[in-house]
Amino acid sequence: METVGRPRGRPRGSKNKPKAPIFVTIDPPMSPYILEVPSGNDVVEALNRFCRGKAIGFCVLSGSGSVADVTLRQPSPAAPGSTITFHGKFDLLSVSATFLPPLPPTSLSPPVSNFFTVSLAGPQGKVIGGFVAGPLVAAGTVYFVATSFKNPSYHRLPATEEEQRNSAEGEEEGQSPPVSGGGGESMYVGGSDVIWDPNAKAPSPY
């Protein structure tokens, strides 16, 4: 009686069975956003709160719409922390802003901070601009185009001894004032008149 043994190895075709595909989701390093801020809201605080909620950094590329009652940081040679407030309605011409993402506890904070700069067109085509140092309230629906980023790396670029010496001298003469700060002045822009209010209160920091 002849005995037939089982063939050795795997059954024919077993190696060629299709395998389920493996998908790996990788978040892009930068993502575009279009954001809408309704009238009556502080656009700076709205963007800052959005970044904190998503734990991301943000770079605002452009904006459109109108805002009211803007407080700007006065440039040098004004006293550090000096601000000026413009009352009225203004159209956004350009926006440049950066909100840094939250850093890990072990990371050293880079010597930079969040900033928000604007160029605005007021009545009669007058243009003002600078670093925002207080609330920036939307006078209508405001739109922003921005991109997000995470885990930025900080690098200090090489500098010559002369550049370092000039930088140290500039810091001794006076540094740029902080974004929020002290006593400010107030301007009311309406039509072609500009009215100064020397008794204006200091704006609250955002």
From Swiss-Prot:
- Region labeled Disordered — which residues? 1-21, 160-206
Q: Which CDD domains match?
A: DUF296
Which residue pairs form cystines in this protein?
Answer: none
Where in the cell does this protein reside? Nucleus
Pfam families (alphabetical): PCC
Origin superkingdom: Eukaryota
**Compositional bias ranges of the Basic residues kind:** 7-18
Output the Gene3D superfamilies linked to this UniProt entry: Hypothetical protein, similar to alpha- acetolactate decarboxylase, domain 2
Ranges for domain PPC come to: 27-173
**Keywords, sorted A to Z:** DNA-binding, Nucleus, Transcription, Transcription regulation
Which cellular component terms (GO) are annotated to the entry?
A: nucleus
UniProt-recorded Gene Ontology molecular function terms: minor groove of adenine-thymine-rich DNA binding
Q: DNA-binding region located at which positions?
A: 5-17
Q: What is known of its domains?
A: The PPC domain mediates interactions between AHL proteins.
**Free-text function comment from the UniProt entry:** Transcription factor that specifically binds AT-rich DNA sequences related to the nuclear matrix attachment regions (MARs).
**Protein name listed in UniProt:** AT-hook motif nuclear-localized protein 28
Record gene name: AHL28
